[in-house]
């Protein structure tokens, strides 16, 4: 024993002495001789590392855990004492200073070496010790597994490894106290135990520089180089016992006797004797061996005297197996007691476990807790520095112990007292090794047991270290780990010790701890990695020890107790460097991870290189999550670990593997694998093999990161790789997502322990896929490195290699969603990537911070495996710690194998960029620090970043800039073109009919001698002709639109098309045109409602009459969930919007409840008003009942009033707005009803606060808008006289808030909406669903909107049996649609639309301002071009023939006047092409032009008047003078509208002139005309026209004016179809009704053919005169009407004059009418007898006319029979004849009378009424309000007058005003056209097509009937003839035929 002790002391002293003075070195030499083979000497470099390392370590560790930040310097006695827990004697003589810091002292060259300063006297420098001890107490239990002649840094490193756990031996005590306690413990031990050679003075040790010492040093250096950490199981207490010259194990321990301090900081007591355990020093040999084994474990292969060391180690281990308690931290509760030896050792572990502050476990837990503090990167001090720092204690071993030292001693004593039996009993080497490993693993000591048993246990304990973080997450894991740690029945106490140091599960982990300090750790890491491979398999009961990271899953089964923890341990192993301090905190002891014995291995790699930093990153990803997993999984695993005692052999077998480290590094995934193992059992035990690695990775990420974080802290760039490999290696399996390919490889048998960090390079292929999975996106950064990485494990941190490898696979995996679920991809990739990129240790140190840890752990987490495999507890823990990391990891996981090639060249883990990423991952700092070296993490983040983008790069093959070839410039000056157009560019030309011409330039390469690259000669390319539809896909509907809609046969097809479009809208998302609006979803739903509403109208033939079916259909679309046939409760349920109860309903006794209101509301929705009344009465809602009853029979009202007891209290129930609005409507407050929805204050932008309902939640003032459907449904189901006004107000309200679709629904159901062009300020609707006010003009080009509006027009006109088109402005939009069809190549359909437009223009005699030249030309042009392109063969320019032209012109003119088909032909597309095109194209259009022109002339005035505004407008319509000049100029000036652009400028002008003059005098109109975008003039015209000039004919104007005069809404609600203006003036409708029948006919006649003459001022006055005469003769009935219109016109001219004229006109008309009737009666009475036979003919002819005439005809018809009887009697004759004669004449007269009077004074008088009052267009504007009444009249759809009224109102009303004003201005001409036009138009509309008029013309003319359009036209001409000689007329006609309108105008 003494020899062994001396050897051990040599070993210890060398390590200590290296730090110490020369004396120590001598002693070390002496002692090291025997031990040298086994133990790597600790380099005293660490001495300086204490101070130097601490800052760096703190930097790296801070992120990981505060524990790391602290370093524990323990004084070692000069004399080597065998610590019962230590396999080797510890040289206490040299002041052993163990610096434990979360970050491995990068300054220390030997990762395994812990800087220990031992004074020659065996004292450690007090100050240094104080500080160091404090850190040790807080963060780590200094373990001195090995001593290096030069460096005691191994001890320090061990301490650091334990400190990596993040817990101090005694967190509560300061370092000084700890040192003091340790010194006391050591002194006590020295006193009790006989001094052995081990305790010889350092001088002796130095004197014995024999082979042992030198060998140890050399070996240690080798280990450092190898990256293998030497885990010297020297109790920190030994170091702490600065004052004791000897290290008496048992006695010393007993002296301390404090159970709390039962466990030395190391977690192992290394005294010459196993006095600590109460066993004699006989154990010394075993202890020596044990430490040798630990060193060997770190790098056993490297010791030449490895076998001897093992031999010594066995006895020492045997003796110390029990004895070495691994000084469970004072706080640590004995988690693991060696089952084999329940002696003091067990007790010690118990105490540690109970305390739960086991040094390692506490370190681990504190690491987690301290994680936020980010352990300082500890750099090893040089031996001299350590010695200097220890100088204070150098005075003597017996120098007073610092409180920390005393505490340490107490811990040791407690441990000895707890398990004295174990200490005394020298267990067999295997038993000792197993127990020792268990305990060491608990403590996370870096002592490698000699035997594989020890290795297995060691791994388990190291796993515990790895689990340190996990231990915090799950106590279960810790407990299980404790049980498993011993595997021999080690008590939880022992496990507690183990957990403080590391999970006892990983016997090999002690080495990882060494690896933290020594380069050997890579070997340990390899071992750890071997465990990670098992980790790939479920870690849960696989033997962690046997699994040693080198063995695949098979190993884990053997040490099933720790298998899980082992795999995870590796990550813990990263912690293990930190675990020394953590071991102090037994919290880690639970060592759920002990099962993952691999953790032990993990620590080794981390020790040296800054990988310490890297561990933190892994921690965040895998580390954080791992703890829960390890805890949960490891406990079971730890139990198996105990049996795994045999595993240590495997462990040593695996040790040889370190040479293969390249693979093991790839296997670093193995490091993660342990994590996987831990996690795997919970979630993915079956998949663990390869993908399990990924899962394990996720799970391991929790556990492993801790150990990884710890170990990596000390690891050098490569040591980090090893360390993080070993400890974070368990994480590798989780990294499997990251390194998943590798972990599988490692598990199979690759010795991952050391390699995981660096070995990733070899395995990258296997692991690469996993890394790719994890970092799939990052490979791009790695690609270059990938190849080298496999072979550069050392050159760059293995993590870097793994990153790349893992990232590449991850890249693929990241793409898959699977990895994403696991955790955020970013975290994962960043972790690995950072580690890899950051090779420098400095960066490692940086990374070592929690952030670094976070990064790496996040990296691990990134792998999806964590989610799939990690146990919930693990995930929760991890998520709590590293939520950020988790987020990043998920995607990376899926394609783990993907990226082997990307593995970047390894970077020193010190550089690990993890720190960079660590910042974000600080949430998991404690875990990360423990988990992995910073370097590991650092590579992760860079890799992550690179991979994150790398996958993108690989996926999108990097595109290099295409070689720019030189062009051969031209020599003709084109080369000077700054645009270089000579190089050529694609050319596209869009032609008619969707034809596209394209030409791409050709670049011909020209090669010349001596040039490698050719020059480019641009050449013109081929011209290709394609169809636009082949280039641009136009939306196709399943059902083709059946348009144009011209007859009822299209109804079925239209409904099918509407249904298909609605279905498409419902299946589509928000249209692009609505996405910019905040309420886009509401707008989308309302758009669908609008389409459904139009479909309902089509299905019900326009809904002209309200029927139950129609109401039901409307309710179906407004309230799809409402079932009218259901019970009220059903309604209340289905209509929650109506009856939703308010939680905060008013508590007033009389307040209405929401349920009764819902019942009332629902009853009203279905039209059951009486039921609603009694429902309200039953619920005591008397106010509701009374309001509803007021609309019912008086009897019901009386009953309700009798029942009514108290006043109504407004209900506070939800959504009362719609009911309140309905009640307002019932009360007659139509316009104010909308205030119930949105209060005026809200519309004004004010927010009002209610003091009444303050108890309820504040309500959005605009929330009432959402009740528009309820309000509409209530109104439609409960119609009241003027409710359309309320709907109009509601529509306007919605329009003001941009709810276009909802507003249009309300407007169309109000049947009073004004449809007009975009230039019409009165128009509320231009196209359904389009906001023409705020939207761009292009919105009007929407085909869907055009077709929907066409469908509405079809429903209301064709299906509604309306005689005329209700939307004259829509013709121009149909033309736009025709052009759109042409562009799409649908020429036949476009031609159909042209024909339909032409027919519509011909069909109506009263033309709207929208029917202008531009429209005519546009239709003709498009039709002609379509005919040419469709193969008519006709040329664009037909050979002109004067005969054809003249004949066609004359025919067209006559047809135009008569409205015959010939006219249609002239204007129609049929022949228009022939006659209209060519040089005389405009002549051919002249008929059209002549129509327009005359109109144009009329409107030509308007353009001028438009500018003039009202007066101009009014006069201009009828003023020929203005019309003439303006006619041409206005059109031209106006320029073309969008449509007009295609046409001649005159097109726009004519329209504008016409409408402008008619519609408005307002400047607004004129600007609109000028700018009329769409229709050119129509724009202005549209706005004005719908209301005023919707009907170009003057007659309509008269009607409109008359109607306007009749402001009352007598007209029926047909306004639905009419424009607001037409319908708005109800007066028009009633007036039209009376006069309409006759006047319309005349209007049409004049309008169609007659308008041009009207336009001519020359003959208008005469016409008016003549007409007046005729009117008086033919029909005086219409005169009254004319009076109205004339009055309106007069008003336009002059208010006073208008009024006077009106009065005069009215009186005169009345008189004339009476006279006419009298004369007619008399004439008839006279005629009857002679014309008896002919009388029948009169009757026949007259019947038709009489039908038109109306009452007189009917009465006469009845009298006819009497007439026969009384043929001779004049009475009979007088009665009948006058009646029959009068009716025919009477009918014509009104138009005539209208015409002349309106043109003349009468005409002017009428216009004044309309004009003056309405102000031309302005009146129409005013009409909107009147329009509401008009709508009501309109609401009377049945009224036949409506057709005319509607048409008239549409445009006629404004025309009336205009006409009136115009007549006023030009008294003569306007009246006549207005008269005839207005009547003709209305009559024509009612009677039908102009053809009938045609026939009647001759008769009509004779009879003076309006129907005879030709006659009317001539009649209008006749007055001119009467006034002017025929030559004038001839000239006029000739001028028309020749196409020169100027003559006509002049005349």
UniProtKB/Swiss-Prot annotation:
One of its GO terms (cellular component) is ER to Golgi transport vesicle membrane. Its main location: endoplasmic reticulum. GO terms for biological process: autophagy; Golgi organization; intracellular transport; protein localization to endoplasmic reticulum exit site; protein transport; vesicle-mediated transport. Residues 361-370, 515-527, 538-550, 696-711, 774-798, 823-833, 840-864, 938-956, 1483-1495, 1538-1547, 1580-1591, 1604-1613 have a biased composition (Polar residues). Keywords: Autophagy, Endoplasmic reticulum, ER-Golgi transport, Membrane, Protein transport, Transport. It is found in: Endoplasmic reticulum membrane. InterPro entries: Sec16_CCD (IPR024340), Sec16_N (IPR024468), Sec16_Sec23-bd (IPR024298). CDD domains: ACE1-Sec16-like. Residues 905-918, 1519-1530, 1854-1867 have a biased composition (Low complexity). Residues 465-474 have a biased composition (Acidic residues). Residues 565-574, 1694-1727 have a biased composition (Basic and acidic residues). Residues 1-57, 347-385, 465-956, 1462-1760, 1773-1904 are annotated as: Disordered. Residues 603-619, 741-766, 893-904 have a biased composition (Pro residues). It is a peripheral membrane protein. Belongs to the SEC16 family. Involved in the initiation of assembly of the COPII coat required for the formation of transport vesicles from the endoplasmic reticulum (ER) and the selection of cargo molecules. Also involved in autophagy. This is COPII coat assembly protein sec16. It comes from Emericella nidulans (strain FGSC A4 / ATCC 38163 / CBS 112.46 / NRRL 194 / M139).
């Amino acid at each position: 024993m003494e020899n062994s002790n001396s050897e051990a002391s040599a070993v210890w002293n060398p390590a200590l002495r290296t730090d110490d003075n020369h004396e120590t070195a001598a002693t070390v030499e002496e002692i090291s001789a025997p031990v040298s083979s086994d133990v790597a000497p600790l380099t005293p470099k660490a001495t300086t590392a204490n101070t130097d390392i601490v800052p760096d370590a703190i930097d790296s560790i801070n992120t990981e855990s505060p524990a790391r930040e602290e370093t524990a310097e323990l004084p070692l006695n000069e004399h080597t004492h065998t610590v019962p827990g230590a396999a080797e004697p510890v040289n206490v003589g040299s002041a052993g200073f163990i610096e434990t810091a979360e970050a491995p002292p990068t300054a220390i060259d030997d990762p395994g070496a812990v800087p220990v300063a031992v004074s020659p006297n065996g004292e450690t420098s007090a100050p240094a010790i104080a500080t160091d001890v404090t850190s040790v107490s807080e963060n780590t239990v200094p373990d001195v597994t090995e001593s290096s002649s030069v460096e005691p840094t191994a001890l320090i490193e061990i301490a650091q490894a334990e400190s990596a756990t993040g817990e101090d031996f005694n967190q509560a005590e300061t370092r000084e106290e700890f040192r003091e306690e340790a010194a006391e413990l050591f002194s006590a031990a020295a006193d009790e135990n006989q001094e052995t050679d081990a305790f010889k003075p350092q001088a002796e040790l130095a004197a014995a520089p024999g082979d042992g010492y030198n060998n140890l040093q050399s070996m240690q250096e080798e280990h450092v180089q190898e990256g293998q950490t030497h885990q010297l199981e020297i109790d920190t207490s030994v170091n702490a016992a600065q004052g004791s010259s000897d290290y008496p194990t048992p006695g010393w321990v007993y002296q301390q006797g404090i159970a709390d301090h039962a466990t030395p900081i190391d977690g192992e007591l290394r005294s010459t004797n196993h006095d600590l355990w109460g066993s004699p020093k006989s154990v010394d040999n075993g202890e020596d061996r044990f430490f040798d084994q630990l060193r060997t474990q770190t790098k056993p292969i490297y010791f030449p005297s490895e076998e001897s060391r093992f031999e010594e180690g066995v006895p020492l281990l045997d003796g110390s197996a029990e004895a070495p308690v691994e000084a469970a931290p004072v706080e640590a509760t004995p988690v693991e007691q060696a089952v084999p030896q329940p002696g003091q050792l067990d007790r010690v572990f118990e105490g540690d476990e109970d305390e739960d502050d086991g040094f390692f476990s506490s370190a681990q837990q504190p690491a987690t807790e301290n994680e936020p503090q980010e352990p300082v990167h500890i750099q090893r001090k040089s031996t001299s520095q350590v010695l200097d720092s220890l100088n204070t204690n150098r005075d003597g071993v017996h120098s007073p112990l610092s409180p920390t030292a005393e505490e340490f001693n107490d811990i040791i004593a407690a441990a000895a007292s707890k398990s004295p039996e174990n200490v005394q009993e020298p267990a067999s080497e295997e038993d000792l090794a197993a127990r020792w490993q268990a305990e060491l693993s608990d403590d996370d000591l870096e002592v490698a047991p000699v035997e594989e048993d020890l290795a297995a246990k060691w791994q388990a304990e190291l796993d515990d270290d790895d689990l340190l973080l996990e231990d915090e997450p799950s106590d279960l894991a810790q407990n299980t780990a404790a049980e498993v740690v011993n595997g021999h029945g080690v008590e939880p106490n022992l496990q507690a010790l183990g957990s403080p140091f590391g999970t006892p599960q990983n016997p090999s982990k002690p080495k990882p701890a060494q690896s933290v300090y020594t380069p050997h750790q890579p070997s340990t890491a390899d071992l750890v990695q071997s465990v990670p491979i098992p980790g790939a398999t479920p870690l849960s009961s696989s033997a962690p020890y046997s699994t040693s990271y080198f063995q695949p899953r098979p190993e884990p089964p053997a040490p099933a107790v720790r298998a899980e923890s082992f795999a995870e341990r590796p990550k813990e192993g990263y912690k293990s460097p930190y675990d020394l301090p953590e071991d102090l905190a037994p919290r880690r002891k639970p060592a759920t991870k002990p099962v993952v014995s691999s953790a032990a291995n993990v620590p080794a790699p981390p020790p040296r290189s800054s990988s310490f930093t890297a561990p933190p990153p892994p921690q965040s990803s895998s580390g954080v999550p791992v703890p829960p997993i390890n805890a949960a999984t490891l406990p079971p695993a730890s139990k198996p670990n105990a049996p795994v005692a045999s595993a240590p052999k495997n462990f040593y077998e695996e040790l040889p593997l370190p040479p293969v480290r390249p693979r093991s590094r790839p296997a670093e995934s193995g490091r993660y694998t342990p994590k996987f193992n831990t996690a795997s059992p919970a979630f993915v035990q079956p998949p663990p093999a390869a993908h399990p690695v990924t899962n394990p990775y996720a799970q391991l990420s929790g556990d492993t990161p801790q150990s990884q974080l710890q170990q990596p802290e000390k690891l050098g760039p490569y040591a980090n790789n090893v360390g993080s490999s070993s400890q974070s290696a368990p994480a590798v399996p989780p990294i499997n997502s990251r390194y998943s390919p590798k972990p599988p490889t490692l598990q199979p048998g690759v010795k991952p322990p050391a390699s995981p960090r660096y070995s990733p390079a070899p395995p990258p292929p296997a692991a690469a896929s996993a890394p790719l999975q994890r970092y799939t996106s990052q490979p791009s950064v790695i690609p270059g490195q990938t190849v080298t990485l496999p072979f550069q494990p050392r050159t760059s941190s293995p993590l870097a290699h793994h990153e790349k490898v893992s990232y590449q696979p991850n890249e693929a995996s990241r793409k898959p969603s699977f990895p994403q679920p696991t955790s955020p991809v970013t975290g994962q990739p960043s972790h690995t990537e950072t580690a890899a990129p950051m090779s420098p240790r400095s960066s490692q140190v940086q990374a070592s911070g929690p952030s670094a840890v976070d990064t790496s752990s996040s990296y691990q987490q990134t792998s999806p495996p964590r989610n799939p495999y990690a146990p919930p507890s693990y995930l929760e823990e991890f998520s709590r710690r590293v939520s950020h990391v988790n987020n990043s990891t998920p995607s990376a996981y899926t394609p783990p194998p993907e990226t082997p090639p990307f593995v970047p060249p390894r970077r020193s883990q010190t550089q690990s960029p993890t720190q960079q990423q660590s910042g974000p991952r600080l949430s998991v700092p404690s875990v990360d620090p423990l988990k992995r070296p910073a370097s590991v993490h650092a590579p992760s983040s860079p890799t992550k970043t690179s991979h994150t983008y790398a996958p993108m790069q690989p996926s999108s093959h990097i595109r290099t800039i295409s070689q720019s070839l030189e062009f051969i410039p031209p020599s003709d000056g084109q080369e000077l073109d700054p645009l270089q157009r000579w190089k050529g560019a694609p050319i596209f030309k869009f032609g008619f009919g969707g034809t596209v011409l394209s030409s791409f330039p050709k670049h011909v390469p020209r090669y010349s001698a001596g040039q490698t690259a050719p020059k480019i000669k641009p050449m013109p390319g081929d011209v290709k002709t394609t169809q636009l539809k082949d280039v641009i896909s136009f939306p196709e509907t399943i059902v083709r639109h059946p348009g144009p809609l011209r007859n009822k046969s299209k109804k079925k097809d239209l409904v099918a098309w509407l249904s298909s479009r609605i279905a498409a809208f419902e299946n589509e998302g928000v249209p692009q045109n609505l996405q910019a609006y905040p309420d886009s979803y509401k707008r989308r739903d309302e758009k669908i409602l609008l389409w459904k509403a139009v479909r309902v109208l089509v299905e019900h033939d326009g809904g002209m009459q309200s029927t139950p079916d129609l109401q039901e259909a409307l309710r179906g679309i407004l309230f799809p969930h409402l079932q009218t046939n259901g019970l009220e409760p059903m309604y209340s349920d289905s209509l929650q919007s109506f009856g939703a109860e308010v939680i905060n309903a008013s508590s007033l006794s009389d307040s209405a409840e929401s349920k009764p209101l819902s019942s009332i509301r629902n009853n009203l929705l279905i039209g059951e008003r009486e039921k609603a009344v009694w429902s309200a009465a039953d619920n005591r809602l008397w106010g509701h009942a009374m309001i509803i009853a007021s609309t019912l029979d008086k009897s019901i009202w009386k009953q309700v009033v009798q029942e009514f007891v108290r006043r109504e209290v407004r209900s506070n129930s939800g959504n009362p707005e719609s009911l309140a609005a309905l009640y307002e409507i019932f009360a007659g407050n139509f316009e104010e009803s909308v205030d119930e929805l949105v209060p005026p204050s809200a519309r004004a932008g004010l927010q009002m606060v209610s003091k009444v309902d303050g108890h309820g939640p504040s309500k959005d003032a605009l929330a009432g808008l959402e009740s528009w459907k309820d309000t509409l449904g209530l109104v439609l189901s409960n119609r009241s006289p003027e409710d359309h006004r309320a709907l109009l107000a509601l529509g306007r309200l919605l329009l003001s808030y941009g709810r276009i679709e909802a507003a249009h629904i309300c407007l169309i159901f109000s049947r009073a909406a004004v449809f007009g062009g975009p230039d019409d300020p009165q128009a509320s609707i231009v196209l359904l669903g389009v906001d023409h006010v705020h939207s761009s003009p292009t919105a009007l080009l929407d085909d869907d909107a055009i077709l929907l509006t066409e469908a509405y027009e079809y429903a209301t006109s064709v299906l509604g049996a309306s005689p005329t088109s209700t939307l004259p402005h829509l013709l121009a939009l149909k033309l736009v649609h025709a052009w759109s069809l042409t562009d799409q190549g649908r020429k036949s359909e476009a031609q159909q639309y042209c024909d339909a437009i032409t027919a519509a223009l011909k069909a109506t005699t009263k033309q709207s301002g929208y029917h202008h030249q531009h429209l005519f030309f546009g239709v003709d042009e498009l039709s002609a071009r379509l005919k040419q392109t469709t193969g008519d063969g006709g040329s664009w320019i037909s050979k002109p023939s004067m005969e054809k032209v003249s004949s066609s012109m004359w025919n067209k003119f006559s047809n135009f006047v008569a409205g015959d088909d010939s006219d249609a032909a002239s204007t129609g597309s049929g022949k228009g092409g022939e006659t209209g095109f060519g040089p005389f194209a405009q002549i051919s259009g002249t008929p059209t032009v002549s129509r327009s022109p005359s109109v144009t002339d009329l409107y030509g005035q308007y353009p001028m008047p438009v500018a003039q505004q009202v007066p101009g407008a009014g006069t201009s319509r009828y003023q020929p003078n203005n019309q003439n000049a303006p006619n041409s100029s206005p059109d031209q000036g106006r320029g073309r509208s969008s449509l007009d652009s295609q046409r001649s400028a005159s097109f726009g002008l004519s329209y504008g002139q016409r409408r402008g003059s008619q519609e408005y005098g307002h400047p607004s109109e004129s600007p609109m005309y000028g700018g009329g975008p769409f229709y050119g003039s129509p724009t202005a015209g549209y706005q004005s026209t719908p209301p005023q000039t919707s009907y170009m004919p003057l007659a309509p104007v008269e009607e409109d004016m008359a109607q306007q005069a009749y402001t009352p809404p007598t007209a029926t609600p047909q306004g639905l179809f009419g424009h607001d203006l037409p319908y708005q003036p109800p007066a028009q409708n009633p007036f039209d009704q009376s006069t309409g029948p006759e006047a319309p006919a005349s209007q049409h006649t004049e309008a169609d053919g007659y308008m041009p003459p009207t336009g001519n001022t020359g003959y208008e006055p005469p016409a008016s005169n003549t007409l007046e005469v005729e009117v008086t003769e033919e029909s005086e009935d219409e005169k009254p009407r004319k009076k109205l219109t004339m009055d309106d016109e007069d008003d336009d001219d002059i208010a006073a004059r208008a009024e006077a004229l009106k009065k005069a006109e009215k009186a005169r008309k009345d008189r004339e009418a009476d006279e006419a009737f009298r004369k007619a009666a008399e004439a008839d009475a006279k005629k009857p007898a002679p014309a008896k036979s002919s009388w029948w003919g009169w009757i026949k002819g007259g019947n038709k006319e009489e039908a038109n005439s109306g009452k007189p005809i009917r009465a006469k018809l009845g009298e006819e029979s009497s007439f026969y009887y009384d043929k001779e009697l004049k009475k009979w004759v007088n009665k009948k004849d006058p009646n029959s004669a009068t009716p025919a004449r009477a009918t014509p007269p009104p138009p005539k009378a209208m015409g002349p009077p309106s043109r003349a004074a009468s005409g002017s008088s009428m216009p004044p009424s309309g004009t003056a009052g309405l102000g031309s267009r302005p009146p129409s504007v005013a009409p909107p309000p009147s329009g509401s009444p008009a709508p009501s009249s309109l609401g009377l759809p049945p009224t036949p007058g409506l057709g005319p009224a509607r048409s008239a109102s549409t445009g006629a009303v404004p025309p009336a005003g205009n006409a009136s004003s115009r007549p006023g201005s030009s008294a003569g001409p306007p009246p006549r056209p207005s008269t005839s036009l207005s009547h003709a138009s209305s009559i024509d509309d009612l009677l039908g097509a102009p053809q009938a008029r045609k026939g009647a013309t001759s008769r009509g003319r004779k009879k003076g009937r309006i129907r005879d359009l030709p006659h009317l036209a001539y009649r209008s001409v006749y007055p001119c003839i009467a006034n002017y000689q025929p030559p004038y007329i001839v000239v006029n006609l000739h001028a028309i035929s020749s196409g020169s309108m100027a003559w006509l105008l002049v005349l």
